[in-house]
Amino acid sequence: METEFDGVITPLKTDISTGDAITPREVRYSFKLMLEDRSIEIWAYNLETVLAEKLETVVSRVTTNTRMRDFYDLHILSQLHGQSIVPADLRAALIATAKKRGTEKYLADAPAAFDEVEADPNMEKLWRAYQKKFSYAADLSWHTVVESIRSLYRLARAE
């Protein structure tokens, strides 16, 4: 979709989902507009559900998940918002997501999945290509990214 404001055309991407398990519930975000003195509010996934959906994808798809953005998102969101993650909510969101997707059986084998992902030369090659395309990821080693994902999983599994 493209938007036009004052003759400037800007591409706009939206991500609309239905039927997902938002756990424990959606949250309202307020965004201050840059060109007007007001804010808009939207309902969106809570942080734990965003993380759970990406984490479940890594666990269930292992090396068939070639979308490096998922790996980057898991790393950067844990770095930027790690202190605000509620472990019980992350655990509940991960279980709800896996149940909705029919992948609950894979959760117990997550540590092995992370090992496989990290050791796979093709995955690391895809990561290097992602780094070249997106400079914000240039200084992040594949090991660092996968270790962040392991840490999130451990947080979700903490009792």
Listing of model-derived features with the role each one plays in the protein:
Residues 1-159:
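Structured mid-to-C-terminal alpha-helical surface segments
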